[in-house]
Design a protein with these regions (language model features):
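Transmembrane alpha-helical segments
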Residues: 43-47, 51-54, 97-109, 160-175, ...
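Hydrophobic core of alpha-helical transmembrane segments in multi-pass integral membrane proteins
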Residues: 7-11, 67-78, 123-140, 164-169, ...
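Loop-centered beta-sheet repeat module
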Residues: 62-110
Length: 256
């Protein structure tokens, strides 16, 4: 639905409507394979019964061994050695590793997680995120290597994994006062991904607008602008998705 919607919106904007309407293009943009994350997520769901079976009756020691082996393959061999088995983490191999890590933390929450202090997790998250940011600045500006700079944010970069797990644990240890708001936003994050990513959706429009805004600022401030722009895009898409769901619910009630 959102792939088609983004296509029709792009048709209404002259700079992105050079070829006119094409039914084949419409079908192509509705195909989930255009978004790597969505396709890998679907595959992970299909594999989840098998993955659950593989860890159903194993002890924590064996479970840890599984995760260590996956880290060696995905991070050590894939990312650090730049092997084609998993160079960037944008594939099902990395999803399986993250799935195992999540299941391990869930199964051993009281033993390995419950005693952790959120302030130390925040420190780990901030430090790892800062190292990612500084590394990107150095690689992109001072070493002038866009390819390596983009690889720096690979999903199997150790710093990305550390910051992600720390952030996940912070939320796992936080008692939410208004879980309805959190759940509503979480339910719309996939729509944000579909609308903002890939050349098959709104990505060209978003990039063009940001390129124009980015040109108004010097380099240091451009990253602040990027953060603000990302927040605005996220808020607009989430707001639109929530509105669409409300309208659809009301329409269903009318025809019920």
């Amino acid at each position: 639905f959102y792939g088609a919607l983004c296509y029709f919106i792009s048709l209404a904007i002259p700079p992105f409507n050079s070829e006119g309407f094409s039914f084949l293009t419409l079908l192509e943009r509705m195909y989930p394979g255009n978004w790597w994350f969505l396709m890998e997520y679907i595959v992970l769901i299909l594999l989840s019964p098998m993955l659950n079976k593989s860890i159903e009756n194993i002890d924590s020691k064996t479970f840890r061994l599984y995760i260590i082996l996956l880290l060696i393959v995905n991070v050590g061999i894939g990312y650090c050695l730049n092997d084609r088995v998993n160079k960037t983490g944008y594939n099902i191999m990395n999803f399986i590793m993250l799935y195992y890590i999540g299941r391990f933390l869930n199964r051993n929450f009281e033993q390995h997680v419950a005693y952790l202090k959120r302030k130390w997790l925040w420190l780990v998250y901030i430090l790892s995120s800062a190292m990612l940011f500084i590394g990107f600045i150095i690689l992109s500006k001072y070493m002038d290597s866009t390819r390596i700079a983009l690889k720096w944010f690979g999903y199997n970069n150790p710093l990305v994994l550390i910051s992600s797990v720390a952030f996940f644990l912070i939320f796992a240890l936080t008692k939410m006062k208004n879980s309805v708001v959190i759940n509503t936003i979480a339910a719309s994050t996939l729509v944000v991904y579909i609308c903002h990513s890939s050349n098959f959706s709104m990505s060209p429009i978003i990039r063009a607008i940001f390129a124009k805004v980015n040109g108004w600022y010097d380099f240091p401030l451009s990253y602040v602008c990027l953060l603000g722009y990302a927040i605005v895009v996220f808020a607009v898409i989430v707001g639109f998705d929530v509105s669409m769901k409300t309208i659809i619910r009301k329409v269903k009630l009318i025809f019920k």
